[in-house]
Amino acid sequence: AINAGALGFSTSRTILHRDVHGVYVPGTEASSDEMKELAFAVDRAGEGTLEIVSDWLDQEIEMSWMKEYVEKSDCGLTVLQTNGDSVKTILYCEEQFLKGKNVRPQFPGRNVGLMFGLESSLHPFIGHPSYKEISHLPLNERLSIMRDPAFKQKILNESPSFREDFQKAAKEQKSNKTKEEIKAEAEIGKKLISNYETQFILSDPPNYEPTREDSIAYLAEQRNQSEEEVIYDELIKDDGKSLIYACFTPYENHKLKFVETFYKLKSSVAGGSDGGAHCGLICDASMPTTNLSHWARDRSAGSKIPLELIIRKQTKTLLKLMGYLIGEK
């Protein structure tokens, strides 16, 4: 494919990437040996870029084959890490880049956020037994049931069945995942929907650098409600069209300080905006627009980033990563 004109090979190793039937995309469960073979197939082609998008459930194993590829190949590599010690990986990429390797960590211009809603593919009640009983119904029928105070109380008294759901999905897909891997994925799923300090009601226009006072945790304190009840009440507003913005990547002190830091790295490249792999949960195709509008023009939570640097990270840097503009600085 590369010899016929493909830019490279991209591999997905995150539980967020599934098809319309909920099945993991190819590569998600591949072994490190298989990944190494795929990576060096790019190398044997003599050109092209390898992209890795991974939850890094076992960081040492992922880093091991990636380091071997970097040491032996002159092809490009770009990494987007969604879990684990991403700083360690990014600093490794920066070190290798400064040594002359075309190794670039991707970073999004805003926190990767999951959109929880009654029409999304994930929200905090999707694993509750009572919600499962009505999940197949049209939105207006689900809303009618969810507005019933008795149903609301029933669902708030339940607990989601994360591990059981992941085990069932693995069995249906004839997955070779171990119990430990399924448990780890279930923990990620639980974390995704229960980190209320970094979940926010999505405003219009969206605010992608919200404060702690905007969080579900803070609203729960102010309303003297549980976080689950706050989310429940918000989800049934606006005829079920309202959305909760749940930060997936770290959002320390409710500021995007990490974006400022990564922009300054020589190796970094603007990314995380494919826009299609998880369109029922994440809407990231507007990331380039956020980079320009928020960071160069509108930001009030801290310092801005020069417009020309943002444009460079989104254009020339990307071209160099993909093997174009060879020799240019």
Q: Where are the regions that the model predicts?
A:
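Polyanionic/metal-chelating signatures
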Residues: 1-2, 24, 42-43, 58, ...
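Hydrophobic, small-residue-rich alpha-helical packing segments that form membrane-like cores
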Residues: 1-49, 53-72
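Flexible, glycine/charged-enriched surface loops at secondary-structure junctions
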Residues: 8-11, 49, 53, 100, ...
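Glycine-rich tight-turn/loop motif centered on a GG-T
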Residues: 20-31, 48-52, 77-79, 245-248, ...
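Hydrophobic, well-ordered secondary-structure elements that form the walls
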Residues: 224, 274, 292, 310-311, ...
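Short, well-structured alpha-helical segments that form the helix of a local strand-helix-strand
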Residues: 228-235, 306-316
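Substrate-recognition/cap regions that form aromatic- and gly/pro-loop-enriched pockets
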Residues: 256-264, 268, 273-305, 323
